[in-house]
Amino acid sequence: ECARRGAEVTLIAGPVQLETRHSRIRRIDVESAEEMYAASQACFFDSDAAILCAAVADFRPEMVADKKIKREKEEELTLHLRATKDIAASLGAVKRKDQLLVGFALETNNEQQNAEGKLERKNFDFIVLNSLNDAGAGFRHDTNKISIIDRKGRTDYPLKSKAEVARDIIDRLSDELKHLTLNS
């Protein structure tokens, strides 16, 4: 949607099978949370806005086997996990006043409270709340129902096609960018 409206877009994509067709989209493919962190850090300085919509793993295995782990006599296998770097928090910590940072939250309980907490912790300008509690919304549907939360409050949107939801989000982003430009 951003590219369709004329923006130059850098898409940092994990291992997905989606094609990127628009000439205004430069795609950077990554395979790990560490690679996504590095690419995000490298691109953010020159960006007017960043939309963080990827569900990046919060943890990674402490050790990675280079061969198949065979089943022995043990019925259990213990994996030790390490936290990955928090991409959103790191960008929020270096965000300039002339940049926007947009996050997403998928919540199933305490939706408002959890989204507001994430908004503050990550220094987002606004956060898009997705709920799995609404019929026809979320994964496996062509529709979604969102709320946009900022420090002033919450705007709820009705169930719409995902293309319409994208337009709503970019409308809000565009309005915020115009406001930044007028006040700088």
Protein language model regions, located:
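Glycine-rich phosphate-binding loop
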Residues: 31-105, 109-133
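Glycine-rich phosphate/diphosphate-binding loop of Rossmann-like nucleotide-binding domains
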Residues: 1-32
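Generic beta-structure capping elements
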Residues: 14, 54-55, 149-151
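Glycine-rich phosphate/adenylate-binding loop
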Residues: 96-98, 110-184
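Generic secondary-structure signature for well-ordered alpha-helical cores
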Residues: 3-8, 17, 41-49, 92-96, ...
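Residue-level detector of flexible, active-site-proximal loop/helix-junction positions
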Residues: 16, 32-34, 108, 153, ...
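Short, structured secondary-structure boundary patches
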Residues: 25, 29-37, 148-152
